[in-house]
Amino acid sequence: MNSRVFNFGAGPAMLPEEILKEAQEEFLNWRNTGMSILEIGHRTPEIISLLSTAEQSLRELLNIPKNYHVLFLGGAARTQFAMIPMNLLRPGDDAAYFITGIWSKMAYHEANLLKKAYYLSSEEKEGFVSIPDYQKWELKSNTAYVYYTPNETINGVRFPYVPKTGGVPLVADMTSCLLSEPININQYGLIFAGAQKNIANAGLTVVIIHEELLKNQPEPVIPTMLNYKNHAEHRSLYATPPVFNCYLASKMFEWIKTQGGIEGLFQRNCLKAAKLYQYLDSTDFYLTPVFKEARSIMNICFSLCYPDLEHKFLDMANERGLKALKGHRFTGGLRASLYNAMPMAGVDALIEFMSEFAKENG
């Protein structure tokens, strides 16, 4: 009997069952080494080959040019909130931030602790339910980079466009959207993403950075573990990388190719999100706060018109195998995350349950 459930959690997220089974089969004896992937030294030929293969697969999926470095770094994506200003801001520089949700707000405050940052737009007063109007902002002349979060995981808000910066490097936190939709790498100076949404398990952060941003490092000297140039020169092997995460990521990259690539997954993701939003818009029992033009494809936030029924909703959903639908602690409410590994069957099961719950409790 298959005991797998539909995990709608914002991260760690659902992984394809076939990848989990492959990892299970290989766990005790990886590539006939007689060792688990967890036991093999990170400077062995096997692991160096694994990292090289993972990087090449990611480059193929995203069409990453040669003048960009791909880094596989250990730790939380939140570390990048500090690494970015430390590496990219020189004395006298400013950084510009779009504050469109909780994560971009945190990144802005971290940058301000370390260096000098200002915000181009803040949607907080309206409750983080919208995106700033296209190109209605003005950059300071000393702006070293522009930072934005294309998809706000907590608030369920998505940029429907890529901000124009007039040649100033664009930095993007793509933790919850990298590999879910096509992007043009050349539009960005730096992209980073925590792995626990669409890439692998928690503990790995992928960084894609243009080589020009590694030059003219600011003073004082950046600590070596927080220095992008150092990690690039050592090909992500300056310290022990999160090998198992990279192993799963490599499998995920290959899996994406079998799903029609990123374009194929994007079409599927759009259909999944559209189906759930269509249901939400058809009933007064559920409320969706985000403006339609700013709705996330990955993270669908909603609430009940009777908030006191929320615990009952979650308990009954759990019994039906619909897990992790509780919203973030900062926002409350409910949230269904529809990452790459979530099948349409999961969306159908959720809508069926929500419809039944509304009829019984409306």
UniProtKB/Swiss-Prot annotation:
It is found in: Cytoplasm. This is Phosphoserine aminotransferase. L-glutamate binds at R43. Binds 1 pyridoxal phosphate per subunit. Belongs to the class-V pyridoxal-phosphate-dependent aminotransferase family. SerC subfamily. One of its GO terms (molecular function) is pyridoxal phosphate binding. The keyword Chloroplast does not apply. Pyridoxal 5'-phosphate binds at A77, R78, W103, T153, D173, Q196. Pathway: Amino-acid biosynthesis; L-serine biosynthesis; L-serine from 3-phospho-D-glycerate: step 2/3; Cofactor biosynthesis; pyridoxine 5'-phosphate biosynthesis; pyridoxine 5'-phosphate from D-erythrose 4-phosphate: step 3/5. It catalyses: O-phospho-L-serine + 2-oxoglutarate = 3-phosphooxypyruvate + L-glutamate; 4-(phosphooxy)-L-threonine + 2-oxoglutarate = (R)-3-hydroxy-2-oxo-4-phosphooxybutanoate + L-glutamate. GO terms for biological process: L-serine biosynthetic process; pyridoxine biosynthetic process. The keyword Transport does not apply. Its EC number is 2.6.1.52. The gene is serC. The modification N6-(pyridoxal phosphate)lysine is found at K197. It is an enzyme of class 2 (transferase). It comes from Legionella pneumophila (strain Lens). Transmembrane segments: none annotated. Its cofactor is pyridoxal 5'-phosphate. One of its GO terms (cellular component) is cytoplasm. Homodimer. Keywords: Amino-acid biosynthesis, Aminotransferase, Cytoplasm, Pyridoxal phosphate, Pyridoxine biosynthesis, Serine biosynthesis, Transferase. Catalyzes the reversible conversion of 3-phosphohydroxypyruvate to phosphoserine and of 3-hydroxy-2-oxo-4-phosphonooxybutanoate to phosphohydroxythreonine. Its main location: cytoplasm.
